[in-house]
Design a protein with these regions (language model features):
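Domain-level signal for soluble alpha/beta catalytic cores
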Residues: 2-169
Length: 169
């Protein structure tokens, strides 16, 4: 899918990405559980409309690209909060809700599949490479059916970037 997007003229002009979904959800009243942050909205079905509305607000504000709301839907974060059983459901749901927002908007926006660091945020992941590969593979496969390309979000080391690219390319 990335190759197909790159063959178009899409990246030949400036494009606007959406804003910080997690912060916007909190500003709109989301109550985060533990360190789940925006994943709380995916776990609780009552918040799915809030996610769609927030995506739509970014689209209406002029975003050419929206990013799936799965930054905190990584295994390590879910395990820390004792909700690892939601991993598959919430990653798929992040893709589904982004597609729903785009479809409702009837605008030609692309959906970027957010791939966050697979351990902590803003710290290099020094765990065994096979663990990181497994986590990237599982998360990328769950969101892949819903997206136009992957977006590597807040990586803290070139090692993580290389591992992610090896998995998705």
């Amino acid at each position: 899918m990335l190759l197909a997007v790159m063959k178009t003229d899409f990246f030949k002009t400036t494009k606007i990405l959406d804003g910080g979904m997690g912060q916007e959800l909190l500003a709109r009243g989301l109550i985060s559980k533990g360190t789940l942050w925006s994943a709380s909205a995916l776990i609780n079905e009552e918040n799915h409309g809030l996610i769609v509305d927030t995506h739509r607000s970014f689209i209406d504000a002029g975003a050419d690209v929206i990013v799936t709301n799965n930054f905190s839907a990584r295994k390590v974060r879910l395990e820390q909060n004792k909700v690892e059983n939601t991993f598959e459901y919430i990653n798929k749901k992040a893709g589904e809700l982004a597609v729903k927002a785009r479809d409702i908007s009837k605008k030609n926006v692309l959906i970027a599949g957010g791939l966050p660091p697979q351990n902590g945020t803003y710290v290099p992941d020094d765990r065994d490479k096979s663990i990181i590969e497994k986590n990237f593979k599982e998360q990328s496969e769950l969101i892949n059916p819903y997206i136009d390309f992957f977006y590597l979000d807040v990586f803290s080391s070139s090692r993580e970037v290389e591992i992610a690219l090896d998995i998705i390319c």
